[in-house]
Amino acid sequence: MPNPHYRSTSYRKIHTKLPSGKSTIHYERRKNNRAVCAICKKPLQGVKTNLLYKYSKTEKRPERMYGGYICYKCLENLIKQTLRGSS
């Protein structure tokens, strides 16, 4: 039976064969997926997803409109559409 803190689903099991020939289970924290744009689904640049508690608020995402949700290209198109539509 594993230790209680390894029974969580936030750890993934890795079956490892040791040099002695025995096989054991090693536990490793799961890694988060990359952050993607809400419109075009491309990976976002400058957005951290793992171990967020180590970073300050400004390091976790860009400080601009829709930072961390929409990529710069989609934001550029969105701004153009709103400006052209309002005139």
Curated annotation (Swiss-Prot):
GO terms for biological process: translation. Transmembrane segments: none annotated. Disulfide bonds: none annotated. Pfam families: Ribosomal_L34e. The keyword Ribonucleoprotein applies. Keywords: Ribonucleoprotein, Ribosomal protein. One of its GO terms (molecular function) is structural constituent of ribosome. One of its GO terms (cellular component) is ribonucleoprotein complex. Belongs to the eukaryotic ribosomal protein eL34 family. NCBIfam families: PRK04059.1 (NF003143). This is Large ribosomal subunit protein eL34.
